[in-house]
Amino acid sequence: MSMASSTQEQYVTVATENYEATCWGCGLRLLLPSHASVFKCGWCGAITNQSKQTCDKQGLRWRRLGDRCILTIVLIFMLFLIFGGVWAVYPVVYSISFFGIFHSVITVTLAVATISSFSLSAFRCAGTPPNLVWGSYPTVANGDLENYTFCHYCSKPKSPRTHHCRSCGKCILDMDHHCPFIGNCVGADNHRSFIAFLISGLFSTIYISIVSAHAGLHVWPPLTYSIGHIHGTTSENLAWRIVKETIFAFLRSVLLLSTRGFILVYLFIASVSMMIGLSALLWQQLRFIYEGETYLSRLSSQAHNGDGNKDCQNVVRFFGFPYSVQRFLPKFLATQKKRHIKGNTHDL
């Protein structure tokens, strides 16, 4: 009798542990074996996270204000590099007729390319997820919301390729990262514009550094040396005196620099610094594109399983080129590539 009562109590305990939960994707009621904060619907495939998430509207307001301030500073700095650079190098670079026309064409081309790509990256929507029908069982078919989650901030479905940006306050499709310098996210709709901005900005900074260095050498005051008598001095002392006098002569010439000269020095230092930063960022972005990943996917745990398809086709697909790379390769190279792929398949 005691064994029967204990068995009945066990069944009652199991029954009371089961609880009902509603799937946000299709609206079906699910019977879960235990209280779980995260579960997946067997019909539509949607993932439900019942943990409470709050939206910090005050923090969102301050983040947007900070992004706009940084964006304004970047715009002013870019305009200063363009117009200030033209004014500083004008007597040396643009005064000669042929070279003036040549450098004017290069300056206008780089300026238009950089400003336009920056504007598309900053003021264009980074990527809007597609609108889906959800919440009702008859309209949601089997597997329509596979691995979708519900964004409590936007109150709509979020695909595995979508991430919610708390700085922008919305979900971004294929989000790579939030860039404070453009005041916007880098996603599916403006990622190519962002790469174009990095490329045009890199070439612009290289051009500015070369032109400012060339103009700076022409406007720099001549160095005056006062080494004095060198008879009776050893070679080591003579070398030290020459180095020291060169440094002092350079510092004395800096005091004689005009306003144009100081601007040229600043342009050279600023352009070289930005060239280094843009080169590193462009290399990182192209490497992620080649590996078929984004910055956020690299940070996630799923990106470290080593199953990524590293191929130039990822680069071609990213830039939207309609044809395969093999179409433009010589026939024997394309054949060798196909044989190599088949060989790897047989090995697997």
Predicted stretch roles:
Residues 1-348:
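Membrane-associated feature with strongest affinity for ZDHHC
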